[in-house]
């Protein structure tokens, strides 16, 4: 099997020594080419090169942003059923998609999962993706406060300062008090009637929405990568209601509910129009401001190599 390993050497948890260790292990089972990214957007270019070159597997070692670039590269190559499988070795600070796919947080253990899947010839999992305008996403996208938090964190990262889950929480708290508490968004679900009076929109392709350290934050517990998108939208930013919903998101088995919350776990599309330009983030990357966006579920879009189920392991 021909494979390319795409590595972001600047991701939070990647090192040269670890890259070489993981590549050596993978090379025992596949014909491996290792390529490192050098700039933003390079991972997508490398993914296109891998598809055109006939790779059957692309292994990504990096954070969520690198994974997103690779997925968009695969999709832009328009290879259809001949597109390579994707496997993810966590290398970032949060690694939402990798964890949602059942991969170990430790990249060495995740490599063992991939090798085991290759040895037993485990079929890949075919999953849906989300798409906003012309950009695909693997785990979430959003308009509003979460996008502004992402921008603030990216600005800090650009200065060379460290980032953390606690930093995200502080920025979210700050952004809440800075934001205009007048609703700016109108949404339409599955091309239905418009619903005005919305402050923010989170759209998920998997559960959980993200993680706070080891704890999953679950906006849409019923959303899976095998079905449609999860919608989470707030029609009120009053502090008591926001705190109540925030507490629900941190509970492992809670289903968020509130008078000011619009939520659905399986929708085909969400169209959003904005009274004023609003920030957009996709898989943790800030894409600038938009005066509207359309989120669509793209079924059966990507084949992902995941850990071996117990039933296969025992055969």
List each model region and its residues.
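Short acidic/glycine-rich loop or secondary-structure boundary segments that cap or lie
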Residues: 146-149, 195-197, 208-213, 239-243
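Structural motif
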Residues: 2, 135-136, 184, 200, ...
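ATP/nucleoside-binding phosphotransfer catalytic cores, i.e., glycine-rich phosphate-binding loops
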Residues: 189-190, 218-226, 233-315
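Gly/Ser/Thr-rich active-site loops/lids in small-molecule metabolic enzymes
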Residues: 155-167, 208-238
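Catalytic core of DAGKc-family lipid kinases
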Residues: 6, 16, 37, 75-200
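ATP/NTP phosphate-donor binding region
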Residues: 1-61, 68, 310-315
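Glycine-rich phosphate/pyrophosphate-binding beta-alpha loops
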Residues: 142, 146, 202-220, 286
């Amino acid at each position: 099997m021909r494979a390319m390993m795409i590595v972001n050497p600047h991701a939070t948890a990647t090192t040269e020594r670890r890259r070489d260790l993981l590549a050596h292990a993978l090379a025992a089972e596949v014909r491996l080419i290792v390529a490192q990214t050098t700039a933003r957007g390079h991972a997508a270019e490398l993914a296109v090169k891998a598809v055109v070159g006939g790779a059957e597997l692309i292994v990504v070692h990096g954070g969520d942003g690198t994974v997103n670039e690779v997925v968009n590269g695969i999709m832009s190559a328009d290879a259809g059923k001949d597109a390579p499988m994707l496997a993810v070795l966590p290398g970032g600070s949060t690694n939402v998609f990798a964890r949602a796919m059942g991969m170990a947080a430790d990249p060495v253990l995740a490599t063992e999962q991939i090798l085991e899947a290759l040895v037993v010839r485990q079929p890949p999992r075919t999953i849906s993706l989300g798409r906003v305008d012309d950009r695909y996403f693997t785990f979430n996208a959003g308009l509003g406060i979460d996008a502004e938090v992402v921008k603030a964190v990216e600005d800090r990262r650009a200065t060379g300062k460290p980032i953390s889950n606690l930093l995200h929480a502080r920025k979210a708290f700050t952004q809440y008090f800075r934001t205009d508490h007048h609703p700016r968004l109108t949404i339409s679900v599955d091309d239905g009637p418009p619903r005005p009076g919305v402050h923010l929109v989170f759209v998920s392709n998997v559960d959980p929405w993200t993680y706070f350290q080891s704890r999953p934050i679950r906006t849409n517990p019923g959303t899976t990568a095998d079905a449609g998108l999860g919608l989470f939208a707030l029609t009120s930013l009053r502090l008591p209601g926001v705190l109540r919903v925030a507490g629900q998101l941190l509970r492992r088995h809670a289903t968020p509910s509130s008078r000011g919350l619009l939520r659905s776990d399986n929708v085909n599309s969400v169209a959003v129009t904005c009274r004023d330009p609003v920030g957009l983030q996709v898989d943790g990357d800030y894409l600038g401001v938009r005066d509207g966006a359309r989120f669509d579920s793209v079924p059966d879009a990507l084949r992902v190599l995941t850990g071996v189920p117990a039933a296969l392991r025992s055969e």
